[in-house]
Amino acid sequence: VVLPLFIVSIIAFLDRVNIAYAGLTMKENLPWLTPEVFGMGAGIFFIGYVLFEVPASLIAARCNAMHWVARIMFSWGLVCILMTTMTTELEFYVYRFLLGLCEASLYPVIYSLLIPNWFLPKERAKAISLMLTSLLFSNIIGGPLAGILLDTTFFGLHGWRTLFIVEAIPAVIFAFIFAFWMKERPEHASWVTNAEKVYIKAELEKEEQQKQAIKKYTTWQALKDPKVLRLALIYFLWVIGFWGFSFWMPQVLKSLSGWPPSVVAWSIAIPMTAALLVQIYCGYSSEKRNEKRWHVATTLFIG
């Protein structure tokens, strides 16, 4: 179950941040792409993301989550393909906004619908930690892949256009594979035994009853909950640094080193590999010691 979600996450992250590597050569064809325009385009993605994250997630909760993920995956793949045709600053902004709109509900659907449908509470931490490694893993393979594609001609397209279209094609294709491979619930999966289906369903129903007995939560109550707001603030402060690093590191490294774009793209894999190893260790250490707060605080402080 984790494998198809892991693949979807890798593809999504590659299509989200490939602009960082494409920016190494885009200025050769797009003279209007100044650092200010690049930064604005990178950031506009999150405007679409924020505006549609909650509404799209609520819609997904009322329909088939599996088919919803397949639909948005196909959509963002098409947007990435269209980015190969852009010639103006406005088109750059529009495509980045649309990409954010299409990807907005992916992770909320995975973390709040699909994983809870398949994993018991005691198993979810491991499932989520595996999913989180997909972000770093995609960066590890994304840099070298971008380095190769920036020097590759594909059906007459070269450089950043090759990068966009080649990394978009897997999203379009895997959307169909995901729709047939992934099942929304264990009871819909043929590879799950009847005994396992009964056990999982009973445990999840028990969990739901316990939740209802404690407190019935509306969406508006969740948005006003101080605990939710504190966690949102912590996450917000973390992602500022994470996305700043992801979008700007290739250009900063190129400026400081003078290396060609392909070498810069390959070199990004080094810090990402180190980050992946530390993340795996922290997850293991946190579970072994049954401690979470200081593991998070220490790594955020060091970062």
Report residues per predicted region.
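Glycine-rich segments within core transmembrane alpha-helices of 12-TM secondary carriers
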Residues: 125-150, 170-171
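Cytoplasmic helix-loop-helix junction between adjacent transmembrane helices
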Residues: 95-133
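Conserved MFS/SLC helix-loop-helix module at the cytosolic interface between two early adjacent transmembrane helices
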Residues: 51-90
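Helix-breaking motifs and short loop linkers at transmembrane-helix boundaries and internal kinks
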Residues: 32, 64, 85-91, 102, ...
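Extracytoplasmic
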Residues: 3-35, 142, 245-250
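Extracytoplasmic gate region of multi-pass secondary transporters
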Residues: 19-21, 220-279
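Cytoplasmic membrane-interface "Motif A"-like loop-to-helix N-cap segments
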Residues: 61-73, 287-300
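Symmetry-related core transmembrane helices of the 12-TM Major Facilitator Superfamily/SLC fold
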Residues: 161-180
